[in-house]
């Protein structure tokens, strides 16, 4: 009798258990599809893989890669100087900034990117670089907004690591006179990620307590300053050597993560902007107010590869979100001209100043990428055109 009591429920519940497993697997598959779509939209929004029209006789120097791999696959080659179409702007690039996105394209990781169209065995597009600043060289006939000689910054169709690039007119704005080309090149992806993460996802309001995890990095240095411009009480998390930097950006409090774990402290925050991706989600929940918001904008940096890479944490977050009172989600920036203009206004007003860690000439792209890979940059890493020495 006892044997029957133990075996019969198993027989009855096994189909139910299998049904639940199938439903969970379908849900996870759906989330992966959604994230793949989001990443594809992000690539389109940044103009990340749009090759310029390479026609004409003049040549220029550009970074080229024909195989996936380490920075050693990157080469400087002579390529044809692009010619703008009717809706494009030809920019003489003065500076370009490196982003983790460039690293992921170079390595071809996470591998799901290859299935999304970047090329299964070799890159379909041999060029890199999104953020740029420079001078307008020529404009298409449908571009009354700019003229030759204008100083601009924005995004350059996935080919900004070059002496010239064609950019969509909607992805550029005029550069403020009070910042350098190097500073302007640091802005597009990093600053708009911080701006949209805090404003659109975090809904930051004056007086709220906001924590920036990874406050000394490319996105983090912008996030501290933008959050302060919103009137928030800002706490920055960084390493010992970067405490003074983060304080200088306006942080009200700083936490040295080598000595203190903010996820185990008593303080609760209204908004957490996570640019690191190493803490467990349960830790963020502990550090948030009951109705707090956690915005994840990083999945671990350039070394986060594998099959789905930084998408793993957002999938886990989406599965958890319906069952908790706090809001937790990922953030992929969209390069919008009005937000570039907003950043230009903040810089003109002196409320935001881009932080530059190192600059490298175009010829030292391998060294620049290796430094980015190390993951300890204080602010942004910049490429400059027409210079021979690293500064």
Which residues are covered by each model-predicted region?
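Glycine-rich phosphate-binding loop and adjacent beta-alpha segment
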Residues: 279-352, 386-391
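Mid-domain Rossmann-like dinucleotide-binding core that forms the NAD(H)/NADP(H) cofactor-binding site
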Residues: 185-256
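C-terminal hydrophobic helical "lid"/dimerization subdomain
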Residues: 2-4, 8-25, 333-391
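NAD(P)H dinucleotide-binding glycine-rich loop of Rossmann-like/cofactor-binding domains
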Residues: 118-131, 138, 151-214
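Glycine-rich beta-strand-centered segment in the early N-terminal region that forms part
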Residues: 82-97, 111-159
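Hydrophobic membrane-insertion alpha-helices, especially the h-region
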Residues: 27-41
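A short acidic, Gly/Pro-enriched loop at the edge of an enzyme's catalytic core
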Residues: 263-271
């Amino acid at each position: 009798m006892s044997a029957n009591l133990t075996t019969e429920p198993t027989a009855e519940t096994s189909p139910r258990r299998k049904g639940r497993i199938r439903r969970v697997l379908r849900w996870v598959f759906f989330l992966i599809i959604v994230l793949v779509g989001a990443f594809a939209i992000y690539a389109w929004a940044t103009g990340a893989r749009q090759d310029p029209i390479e026609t004409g006789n003049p040549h220029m120097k550009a970074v080229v890669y024909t195989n996936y791999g380490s920075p050693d696959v990157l080469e400087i080659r002579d390529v044809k100087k692009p010619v703008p179409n009717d809706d494009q702007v030809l920019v003489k690039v003065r500076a370009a900034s490196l982003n983790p996105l460039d690293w992921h394209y170079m390595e071809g990781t996470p591998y799901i990117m290859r299935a999304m169209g970047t090329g299964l065995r070799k890159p379909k597009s041999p060029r890199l670089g999104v953020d740029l600043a420079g001078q307008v060289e020529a404009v298409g006939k449908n571009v009354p907004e700019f003229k030759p000689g204008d100083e601009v910054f924005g995004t350059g169709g996935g080919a900004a690591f070059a002496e010239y690039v064609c950019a969509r007119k909607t992805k550029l704005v005029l550069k403020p006179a009070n910042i350098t080309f190097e500073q302007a090149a640091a802005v597009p992806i990093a600053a708009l990620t911080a701006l949209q993460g805090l404003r659109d996802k975090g809904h930051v309001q004056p007086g709220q307590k906001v924590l920036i995890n990874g406050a000394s990095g490319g996105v983090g240095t912008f996030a501290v300053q933008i959050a302060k411009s919103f009137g928030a009480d800002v706490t920055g998390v960084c390493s010992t050597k970067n405490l003074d930097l983060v304080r200088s950006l306006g942080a009200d409090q700083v936490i040295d993560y080598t000595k203190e774990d903010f996820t185990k402290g008593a303080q609760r925050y209204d908004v957490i902007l996570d640019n690191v991706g190493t803490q467990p989600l349960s830790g963020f929940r502990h550090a948030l107010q009951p109705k707090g918001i956690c915005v994840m904008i990083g999945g671990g940096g350039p070394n986060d590869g594998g099959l789905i890479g930084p998408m793993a944490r957002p999938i886990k977050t989406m599965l958890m979100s319906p069952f908790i009172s706090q809001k937790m989600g990922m953030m992929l920036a969209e390069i919008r001209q009005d937000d570039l203009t907003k950043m230009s206004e903040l810089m003109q007003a002196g409320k935001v100043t881009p932080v530059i860690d190192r600059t490298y000439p175009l010829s030292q792209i391998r060294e620049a990428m290796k430094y980015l890979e190390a993951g300890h940059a204080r602010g942004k890493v910049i490429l400059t055109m027409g210079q021979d020495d690293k500064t």
